[in-house]
Every structure is written in C-alpha cells, then in structure tokens.
Amino acid sequence: MKNKLLARVARLGGLSSALLLAGCELDVLDPKGPVGEGVKTLIATSTVAMLIVVIPTILETLLFAWQYRQSNTSAEYLPKWCHSNKIEVTIWGVPSLIILFLAVITYQTCHSLDPYKPLEAEANTKPLHVEVVALDWKWLFIYPEQGIATVNQLAIPVNTPIDFNITSDSVMNSFFIPRLGSMIYAMAGMQTQLHLLASEPGDYLGESANYSGRGFSDMKFHTLAVSGDEFNAWVEKVKSSSEQLDSQTYPKLAAPSENPVEYFAHVEPGMFNTIVAKYNNGMVMDKSTGKMIQVQQSAMSDMNMKE
C-alpha cells in the first residue's frame, strides 16, 4: 500500500513539473537576430554531438542490465576477461573526436560572434549608438546622437546594427537580451561593448543575468524592435517629456530603486563618460586614440565622484 502511494505521488509530481515547465519560454532557442541565430546553432550542434555519446551509453547500460540479469542463465560468463582493443578504441576514440569537434566549432563561433566585432549592415544603413548604464536596480539607456535617455525601455530600428557601450554605476551586472544574442558584463569604471541586430519587429525582454541585490529579480527592460519611421516617432515621443538628465538630476535616478519606464527629453553631453570616470580618478578612455583623457571637473564634482 505504501509503495503504491509513493508511486502515485511520484507520478503526480512528475506530471506537475512537466506542466509547470511547459509554461517556460526558451527565448535563447527562438532568436530574432543573426547573433542569436549563431548562438542557437552552436547550442543545437553541441547538444547533438554530445548525444552521440550519451544515447549509446544509456542504451548499452540498459542492454547490459537485461542481458546479464540473474534469471538469464544462458548469458556467457567470462570471469577472466580483462581487455578489448575494440572497446578501448571506441570508448576513448569517439569522445576524443567529439571533444575535438566541439573545440573547433566553439572556437570558430566565439570569434565570429565576438561581441566587440561590428556587424555587417545593408548599404547606407548607419549603426545606432546606445550607451547603457546598470544601476540599482534598473537600466539607463542613453542615445547620444539623439540627445535623449530612457529607463527600462530600449527602442531600436529593425535591421540596423546597434553598437552598445556598457558600464555600471554600482556592482557588476550582466546585460542580456536573450532573443537577440550575446550577454556581456557591465562593470563600474569600465566600458564593455556589444553589437546586436534585430531582424524582426517585436517586444523582446532584456534582463540582468547577475545577482545584484534585493531588486535584481525585477531588473528587466523591454526592447522594442520597430521600423525606422516608428523609431523616429518614438524618439519624438521621448523628446516631448518634461524630464531632463544632467549632473543635478542623475544622483536621484542612480539611488537604489525599482523604476518604471521613464523618459528624458535631454541628456547632458558626456554623461556616460562622466559616470565611467567616477571610478577612474576622473579619467576615461578615448575610443579614437585609446588614451586616457580627463573628464570635466565640474561635472565630476556635481555627481559626487566616488573613490
């Protein structure tokens, strides 16, 4: 009776788990951009290659258990057997070839999907530059060319390369849009880069992939992939906001909070560099020369430079 009850509980638990897992979305396996497609291909290829070892091993284990079960008195008994060249070649050779194969495709994919590598675009398509700042517990997006900024909402035109510059004004975080591709760290005083492209319109969830405190679980944002005209209309919508982001208003935004979507019609020029320089004694790297340059001292003092 007790065994039957345990079996029923186990079956019910298994069915419940399957039902719950059915509600999970595997965004990484439903990519909407070339980088995401490359990641998906690598995952699928690696999984199939590993199953070449896993499936035969499971089948052989089941076959061995059946063949040499206690009731099978006709099974051949070889108490002095100790070696087989065929078995040795198989169990060492096949996995070694698979590991070599995985090493080659992983190396090739990692270099082809290098987050610092600019993406190819259609003729006359200019990349969009976005500066990203990880805060507690929200994301700040600065559009330097448009002179605007948003919190927890990122809009990008479809089929346009997006060049991200990423930093943090708090602990280390990870910037990740699963359906578009690569994840990369956001670190205080440093600038990391990421190049992505959305090949289809949609609303794609972005998130932090690093635990960073109490509000981490809600540190998400929406990525709106829209047409060029819709993007221009969105920019005008942001510019109609009455809010501005400068050295006076930024400290309030940077304070720990879980902000909803917020628009800033104007951003103080050089805001991103000022944030990075807070952790580098007022210095920031000039991308064109690779040299460290000094950020304006007035902006640094207004933002309460951290040691």
UniProtKB/Swiss-Prot annotation:
The lineage of its organism: Bacteria, Pseudomonadati, Pseudomonadota, Alphaproteobacteria, Acetobacterales. It comes from Acetobacter aceti. Residues 1-23 form the signal peptide. Belongs to the cytochrome c oxidase subunit 2 family. The chain crosses the membrane at residues 46-66, 87-107. NCBIfam families: CyoA. It is found in: Cell membrane. This is Ubiquinol oxidase subunit 2. SUPFAM superfamilies: Cupredoxins, Cytochrome c oxidase subunit II-like, transmembrane region. Its main location: membrane.
